[in-house]
């Protein structure tokens, strides 16, 4: 699967306000390097980006439940037995991938889990599964997250989880569900052990590309090019900027004509719109240069 993914530690948050830290300015130049970046949600990936874990002490769930007390109806006893059997299957599945020392599924187990599900750790389906499991951090499922997640999607085995993927992907297309997934993704990308409050710029680029897999905004490529070139010298993406970008894609048209700096947008959006409009202007001027030369030659031929 390639190199083990790692995290950039302690990025400085510069966004969500008008006074972010800046690096050296660079000339406007369109870049597409963000298109080659991938981020692994569970295990190893082809490009080093980000992996983190949470502190030990996560609350554990009991693997089994007591049988129904005497006096219950036969139907209730059968239902309890079926529920117990499902819990046992989830327990067996959890133990198949859990770490030898910690009561959680960690990097190696997550990679085997993804392999058995026939999914790549860098793909959208893994992010959706982490969302349904309400995973607190990348590359880790605690016992509680795994048990509650399997119950939430009504699956207790590999085949059952695989069978749920189509409906989970359809669910993620719903506007309210996608908004929840989108906001989850920001928290999911933070390093909880380091107390991060902002996403490192490169991590944010990878996560934006991933979370918009099914409903890509028309302006996304330009936004990611802007962040990759980084003319404003930003170092981190705040929660406010992350959340507001979804609103930006829904309210502002791809031609950016209805964008107003007077509205309460993060200052980074002001810089982006200015950068993008300048880029488009330069692109049009470049196209007109050969046209102008052709017209001059045509005029000389007529005379």
UniProtKB/Swiss-Prot annotation:
Pfam families, sorted: Cullin_binding
Amino acid composition bias (Polar residues), ranges on this chain: 294-303
InterPro entries (alphabetical): DCN-prot, DCN1-like_PONY, PONY_dom
Annotated region described as Disordered, given as residue ranges: 1-41, 62-83, 284-303
UniProt xrefs under PROSITE patterns: DCUN1 (PS51229)
Entry annotated with the keyword Repeat: no
Gene Ontology CC terms, in alphabetical order: cytoplasm; nucleus; perinuclear region of cytoplasm; plasma membrane
Record keywords, A-Z: Cell membrane, Cytoplasm, Lipoprotein, Membrane, Myristate, Nucleus
Cellular location(s): Cell membrane; Cytoplasm; Nucleus; Cytoplasm, Perinuclear region
Primary localization: membrane
Lipidation (N-myristoyl glycine): 2
Keyword Ion transport applies: no
Molecular-function GO terms, alphabetical: cullin family protein binding
GO BP, sorted A to Z: negative regulation of protein neddylation; positive regulation of protein neddylation; regulation of cell cycle process; regulation of protein neddylation
Domain DCUN1 positions: 85-277
Function: Contributes to the neddylation of all cullins by transferring NEDD8 from N-terminally acetylated NEDD8-conjugating E2s enzyme to different cullin C-terminal domain-RBX complexes. At the cell membrane, can promote and as well inhibit cullins neddylation.
Summary of subunit composition and partner proteins: May interact (via the DCUN1 domain) with unneddylated cullins.
Entry note about domains: The DCUN1 domain, also known as PONY domain, mediates the interaction with different cullins.
Entry protein name: DCN1-like protein 3
Gene symbol of the encoding locus: dcun1d3
């Amino acid at each position: 699967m390639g190199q083990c993914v790692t995290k950039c530690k302690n990025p400085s948050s510069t966004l969500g306000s008008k006074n972010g830290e800046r690096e050296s300015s660079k000339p406007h130049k369109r870049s597409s390097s963000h298109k080659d970046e991938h981020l692994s949600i569970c295990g190893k990936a082809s490009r080093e980006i980000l992996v983190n874990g949470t502190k030990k002490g996560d609350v554990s769930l009991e693997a089994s439940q007591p049988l129904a007390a005497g006096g219950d109806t036969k139907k209730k006893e059968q239902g309890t037995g079926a529920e117990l059997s499902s819990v046992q299957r989830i327990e067996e599945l959890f133990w198949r991938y859990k770490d030898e020392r910690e009561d959680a599924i960690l990097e190696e187990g997550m990679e085997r889990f993804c392999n058995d599900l026939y999914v790549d750790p860098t793909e959208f389906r893994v992010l959706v599964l982490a969302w349904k499991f309400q995973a607190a951090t990348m590359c880790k499922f605690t016992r509680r997250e795994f048990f509650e997640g399997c119950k939430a999607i009504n699956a207790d085995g590999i085949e059952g989880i695989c069978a749920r993927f189509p409906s989970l992907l359809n669910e993620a297309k719903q506007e309210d569900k996608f908004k929840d997934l989108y906001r989850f993704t920001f928290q999911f990308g933070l390093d909880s052990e380091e107390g991060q409050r902002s996403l490192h710029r490169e991590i944010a680029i990878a996560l934006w590309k991933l979370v918009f897999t099914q409903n890509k905004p028309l302006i996304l490529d330009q936004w990611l090019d802007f962040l990759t070139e980084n003319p404003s010298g930003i170092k981190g993406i705040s929660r406010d900027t992350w959340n507001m970008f979804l609103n930006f894609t829904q309210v502002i048209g791809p031609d950016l004509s209805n964008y107003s700096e007077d509205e309460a947008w993060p200052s980074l959006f002001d810089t982006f719109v200015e950068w993008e409009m300048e880029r488009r202007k330069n692109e049009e001027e470049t196209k007109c240069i050969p046209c102008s030369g052709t017209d001059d030659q045509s005029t000389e031929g007529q005379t």
